[in-house]
Amino acid sequence: MSKFFVNVAPINNSNSSSSHTTTSSNTQRHQQHQQHYGGSGTTGHTMVARRLNYDLHGGTTSINNNNNIVIKNESVDLDYDHVLSSSDSNSNGGVAAHLRDHVYISLDKGHNTGAVATAAAAATAGHTQQQLQQQHHHQNQQQRKATGKSNDITNYYKVKRRPHAVSDEIHPKKQAKQSAHHQTVYQKHTASSAPQQLRHSHHQLRHDADAELDEDVVERVAKPASHHPFSLSTPQQQLAASVASSSSSGDRNRADTSLGILTKKFVDLLQESPDGVVDLNEASNRLHVQKRRIYDITNVLEGINILEKKSKNNIQWRCGQSMVSQERSRHIEADSLRLEQQENELNKAIDLMRENLAEISQEVENSGGMAYVTQNDLLNVDLFKDQIVIVIKAPPEAKLVLPNTKLPREIYVKAENSGEINVFLCHDTSPENSPIAPGAGYVGAPGAGCVRTATSTRLHPLTNQRLNDPLFNNIDAMSTKGLFQTPYRSARNLSKSIEEAAKQSQPEYNNICDIAMGQHHNLNQQQQQQQQQLLQQPEEDDVDVELNQLVPTLTNPVVRTHQFQQHQQPSIQELFSSLTESSPPTPTKRRREAAAAAIAAGSSTTATTTLNSHNNRNHSNHSNHSNHSSSNNSKSQPPTIGYGSSQRRSDVPMYNCAMEGATTTSATADTTAATSRSAAASSLQMQFAAVAESNNGSSSGGGGGGGGYGSIAGAGANADPHQPYSHDRNSLPPGVADCDANSNSSSVTLQGLDALFNDIGSDYFSNDIAFVSINPPDDNDYPYALNANEGIDRLFDFGSDAYGP
């Protein structure tokens, strides 16, 4: 509510009305003062209200010049507008108890001049005041009679009384604002023509005005005395002005009373407390702030679980006697020290890296911009020892991604602009680490100084020195994997391959048998000529030929012959590479019975070989061949051929492969001259070859001409005419041959059975079951895809156990 009052009665603009109102107002004020201070108690209580009147500086109210406006501070005596008359002793009668501390100023709507009017500072003469007082009293009585009790409460303005003096402190901003917009002019009330009886009342009026000046906040503007257009006449005014100026200059700043500073001070009080408990009343007194400010701090600290309320006005830290425990403080200090040390180490490392980078840059500049490393530089690094080093040359913007850091087996290099990426293998070419070393050939071979390869190392693991290279360390494990159980997929693939080869080879094999039965006489002469040509050639041990013999294919049987020791022996053996004996034993028994019958009947012999590859059972029989020779003519008796003991292996059935582990022997017997007829079937566009020799001779103690086996090596070709033979008497025993794929150029026994057949009908092979189909496993049992390369290691069995000493 405003501290100033404006005119509540409508002001008449006419000069006469204004002049009359001013005169009556001055008279009324003087009369009221005289009644109040002069001991007249018949009138009601009055209140001095301060109002600002804007009068023109010229003193004339008729001039409408607003440029010269002087603010006048006047004291106006106001009467309570009560229903009771002025003669009533109880002026508060009829006012409610809760409204007694207020002053109500009535608004007279029907009269031109109200109870409150503009007041002037000049005092009039005594007789004039007497008349005006009587006139004003008469007007008040008429007003009360007219209005009566009809005045509504809304017609009053409420003014709050001030039971206590206002504090001397004024905010600097408010004080500056008031000093800028208001200029209070103090005007002394002097009575030049007043009589002696009014001097005391005017002195009391000035004293009351000075008291009101001390109580009112708005009137105390911090200005020096020199700025006022008037001088302060009383000591009270000078004291008030000095207090106002000192309070304004020494006022505290807002930052001093902020919550942040108060919170710090409050925390200091908590730390000073021995048990961490602080009384809020004591804190408010020590900090010189209101208690609600302390509550603002404690509410926030309670919200973040730092404080807890112990009682009504006592709060305590939640962490106990100290805000931070000693152990936690030690941990914090240790962590801070450790982090500082790490920071120092990192700073040193960064400085070192910068120095190294500067040195490298300087070296590059000194070398003319050429920065490169050689292969030896990379291989000499200890980190890359015994490792495969790969050098990648990529554009600068290329990205290298390592998918799995735990198993760094793969890396991805990608160029953003599709630049060229070059990858180089940095390998060690020193002699001790080279995978190809000179001077390591076959033992005892002429080419001992040839290059040693991985194949020769695998075929000769016992006679050759092992390579010192990490790439060939597991060569034995690779070569012996055929010794383990064949997986389902390999077994199925092997069965499929055998079946397909059997279907392709069966018609041609039957055709060979028919030709051998019908044209065996013509073949005898051709085989004799081939045998003579082979005997004339020297024996050689060629490594390439040996490797070709040791690495056959599915349809390429290899037979290697050796020297036949006994000369002039009329033994004829016909060699055939045969299929695996996977058929039931019934056809085998039939062939054996037919061979025995043919030998007993003395028919011409026919050489054949029984399919016995990869079956490790040996059958050995001894048959005696009797050769009788005379001086005039020589006849050959049909030799007797028995089945020898052979080792059979039933793990992998095969057909049309090399023969192993069979021996045939021949002995001489003193019999009469007989004619020996031999027939051999040679391969026509197949992998079979035969050598036959027919000689007539007789010996009693072992002597005569020489004969031997011919070497059969080649796919779909006849007997090799270049295979060497020798006639040394101290050579190996007769009938020794090898065709195993695992052979290491040493003499092993010939696998298979050599049989001599005489007068066997052409319907023998048609009645006998030469081939038995191999049914592959069902696809439901082995749902795997076929692979033509699987089973090869198992088929040829490159195992280390097959090598002989």
Swiss-Prot record:
Give the region (Dimerization) as residue ranges. 318-411
Keywords on record:
Activator, Developmental protein, DNA-binding, Nucleus, Phosphoprotein, Transcription, Transcription regulation, Ubl conjugation
For this chain the motif PIP-box K+4 motif maps to: 147-161
Q: Where is this region: Disordered?
A: 9-45, 119-208, 224-255, 578-650, 714-743
Q: Note the DNA-binding span(s) on this chain.
A: 253-318
Provide one Gene Ontology cellular component. Answer: nucleus
GO terms classed as biological process: cellular response to gamma radiation; DNA endoreduplication; eggshell chorion gene amplification; G1/S transition of mitotic cell cycle; larval lymph gland hemopoiesis; negative regulation of transcription by RNA polymerase II; positive regulation of apoptotic process; positive regulation of DNA endoreduplication
Listed Pfam families: E2F_CC-MB, E2F_TDP
How does the record describe the protein's post-translational processing?
Answer: Ubiquitinated by the DCX(DTL) complex, also named CRL4(CDT2) complex, leading to its degradation during S phase. Ubiquitination by the DCX(DTL) complex is essential for cell cycle control and is PCNA-dependent: interacts with PCNA via its PIP-box, while the presence of the containing the 'K+4' motif in the PIP box, recruit the DCX(DTL) complex, leading to its degradation.
Q: Which domain of life is it from?
A: Eukaryota
Record-annotated membrane-spanning stretches? none
- What tissue specificity does the UniProt entry give? Segmentally repeated expression throughout early embryos is restricted to the ventral nerve cord in later embryos.
Question: Which residue stretches does the UniProt record annotate as biased composition, category Low complexity?
Answer: 12-37, 119-134, 240-249, 595-615, 623-636
Residues recorded with modification Phosphoserine: 434
Q: What one GO molecular function would you report for this record? A: DNA-binding transcription activator activity, RNA polymerase II-specific
Spell out the Polar residues composition-biased ranges.
Answer: 144-154, 181-195, 637-647
What function does the entry list? Transcriptional activator that binds to E2f sites. Required for wild-type growth in mitotic and polytene tissues, Contributes to the expression of replication genes at the G1-S transition and Cyclin E. Activates cell proliferation in wing imaginal disk, which requires expression of vg.
The Swiss-Prot or TrEMBL note on domains reads: The PIP-box K+4 motif mediates both the interaction with PCNA and the recruitment of the DCX(DTL) complex: while the PIP-box interacts with PCNA, the presence of the K+4 submotif, recruits the DCX(DTL) complex, leading to its ubiquitination.
Question: Know the name of this protein?
Answer: Transcription factor E2f1
Q: Which gene encodes it?
A: E2f1
